[in-house]
Every structure is written in C-alpha cells, then in structure tokens.
Amino acid sequence: MQKINDLKILFFDVGGILLSNGWGHESRKKAAVKFGLDYAEVDVLHNFIFNVYEIGSITLDEYLDTVIFNYPRDFVRQDFKDFMYSESVELPDMLQWLKEWKKDCGFRIISINNEGKELNDYRVQKFKLHKAFDAFISSCEVKMRKPDPGIFKLA
C-alpha cells in the first residue's frame, strides 16, 4: 500500500480555483447585456453545444456560429471574442501563491480542466500557467471532460 508521504503529484483545476470560470453563466449574462442578446436563448444554445466545444470537437468560431452569430448582429465576432477573453481574470492570491510554492514543493503539479482550445490557450499564455503547472490535461486536447473517469485515468 502506498503511503501518503510517497505521493508526489497534485492535481488542480483552474476555473473557479485560480482564475474565473472560462465562460461561466455570469460572463454570459454580462455578454447578453453588453451585446443586447436574449440571455435565455443564449443559455439554451450554449448548453446544447458547449460540451462539444470543450472536448475540442468544434472551434470557438463554430461555437459562436451556433450560439451568437446564428442571426445577423450589429457587432463583430472579434469584439465578442475579446469580451470573452476579458472575462478571464485571476482570483485573489491563489495563482501567485501556487507559482511561488511550486518552486520548492517537490511535487509535480498538473492541471485537469474543462476548457475549449482557444480559451484554454489564451488563459495558459495570459496568466503564464506554465509557471504553475508541469502538465495540462485539458478536455479540448484529450476529448473528454470531467467528471468522465477516463480523464482522471489519463492523469
């Protein structure tokens, strides 16, 4: 039997722990107000297709075609994407603490997260998540989402 002292890997989520959720309901509500969208309709369409986006089966543009740009709009796609990205913010204290702690902790730290590729890539680059994690197991790359047991078996 393995002793707890032998464990050398820690798994972290990103959304809601270190950063805001990538594209949570609060952000979608803000988008509805900012861009004059019907939130109830956006929410139904989002729930219909977002899992497919998170496992990397469609791109962000394809997600947006289904959920936002299924009608002519008086705003452009890039403005909407910029808004989506701007909703990713660092939560107080945790990320900086993890980056510092990781330097001498002796553990491998691995991120397991449900993120679409474009949002995942943006967040890794913008918040320099490579300084906090040794590896990423992202739903968009492994074609499975938490809580699918398969994603944890990969870890």
Where are each of the predicted segments found?
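Short, acidic loop-to-helix structural element flanking the phosphoryl-transfer center
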Residues: 6-9, 69, 78-110, 121, ...
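Alpha-helical elements of Rossmann-like donor-binding domains used by nucleotide-donor carbohydrate transfer enzymes
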Residues: 26-30, 48, 62, 66, ...
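Active-site neighborhood of HAD-like aspartate-dependent phosphohydrolases
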Residues: 2-45
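Short, conserved loop/helix-junction motifs that constitute active-site signature segments
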Residues: 4, 102-104, 128-132
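A metal-dependent, Asp-based hydrolase signature
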Residues: 51-81
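Substrate-recognition "cap/lid" segment bordering the active-site pocket of phosphatases
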Residues: 117-155
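Short, solvent-exposed loop/turn segments at secondary-structure junctions
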Residues: 17-18, 24-25, 115-118, 142-143
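Generic structural signal for small/hydrophobic residues in well-ordered secondary structure
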Residues: 13-16, 56, 101, 111, ...
